[in-house]
Amino acid sequence: MNPKQCAAQAAMKYVTSQMAVGLGTGTTADFFLISLAQAIKAGELKEIKGVPTSRQSERRAIELGIPLFSLAQCPVCDITVDGADEVAPNLDLIKGLGGALLREKIVAQNSKKLVIIADEGKVVSQLGSKSPLPVEVAQFGYETQEGFLRSLGAQPKLRVGPGGMVFVTDNGNCIYDCHFAGGIKNAGEIEAALNRCAGIVESGLFLGMASIALIGSEGGVREIRRG
């Protein structure tokens, strides 16, 4: 197994029968969905309720035969297992390069435990060192957000999809990918400023949310717990 698969498999020990499980989005989360589906088919896990974090994870769960439920049906998940684009030593995260940050955060904040699975390359000493920060904005007046994001020290770039068309999220919004020279030194302040601005729907800063990170490498999987 590759490091992502190893991390995904390690997360299975936190899942037991009758759990409501938040189903993450992305390549690493997909390995978890495969492992979860195999355990369900083998009868090792029973009465699992999968809560998808995107249309992508919803489609994948249907393909794999994972029973799906909405947040209205499962307002509190026992656990969510998801990937991350960056993992800081204190388990603060950047997520959202796959475009599902809003739904991922909604499901995560309605979960008793958020378990992050990633490979060693996603571990950073400071958020923003490698990955841009995705910021989801309403389509109405989205052009006006660029100046505000620059005022926070970011170098924003509007995300475009295939054919050069503006990328649109599952929720009908746009995304600015924001690079910060030297990384994000004041993540809490940046998050607070973003939350105050009308038209900014959500950011990929997941601060104080993860309980455990399982980091896969060629040498195995190491577990990091929030202190």
Name each model feature, range by range:
Residues 1-82:
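N-terminal active-site beta-alpha-beta segment that forms phosphate/nucleotide-binding
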Residues 2-5, 55-227:
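Conserved phosphate- and dinucleotide-binding cores of soluble alpha/beta proteins
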